[in-house]
C-alpha cells in the first residue's frame, strides 16, 4: 500500500507530463490497484454536498485532446467493476450513502458558469472538477485497476440558490473526512482479501 497526498493541476501551470508523473511512479513501485480521490461539485440535487460518488464514466471538457464533441467514456480500463463492487459493499456495511455518476473535467481555476453546468447536465454529467482525468487516463494506459471517488463538496453553480464559495468547499470536505476514511480503509481491506 502506498498513499500519495495532493496533486498537481494544469491550472497551476503544470504540464500534463508533470500531472501524470506520480501515476507512473506508483506503477514503477508495483502498485496494481489505484484509488484516486478528488473534491468535485455536484450537478444533481439528489447528490448533496457531503456525498461520495464512484466515478463510472468521465467527460473531458478541456478540449485539449482535439475533440470538440465531448462524450462520456465508460471504458472498463478506466473504471474497474471489481473495485467499484468492493466500494459498494463497504459503503453498505458502514451506512455510507455512495452515489454513482459521470465526472466532468474542466481546466479551472475559476468555478464554472451556470450555462456550462447546464451543458454538462445535458450530457449526463453528475459532478465537475478541475483534476483527476489525466491520472485516470494514465492509470488505465498503464494497466492499473482504477477506482475514482469524488467527494461532492458543493453544488455546482446554478444548482443551489446559495452562491458558491471556496469556504463551503473546505467546510464540507472537512465534515466528510470520517466517511471517506472509513470507506477507503474498508476498500483497502477488501482488496487485500
Ranges and model annotations:
Residues 3-5, 34-38, 54, 98-104, ...:
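General beta-strand structural signal in soluble alpha/beta enzymes
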Residues 130-168:
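Zn-dependent metallopeptidase/amidohydrolase metal-coordination segment
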Residues 82, 86-96, 182-190:
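Generic non-transmembrane alpha-helical segments
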Residues 1-75:
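Metabolite-binding pocket within alpha/beta catalytic cores that recognizes anionic/polar moieties
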Residues 89-126:
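Active-site/ligand-binding-proximal alpha/beta "capping" segment
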Residues 157-193:
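His/Asp/Glu-rich mid-to-C-terminal helical/loop segments that flank catalytic regions of hydrolases
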Residues 27-30, 121, 140:
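Non-catalytic positions within long, well-ordered alpha-helices that form the structural scaffold/packing
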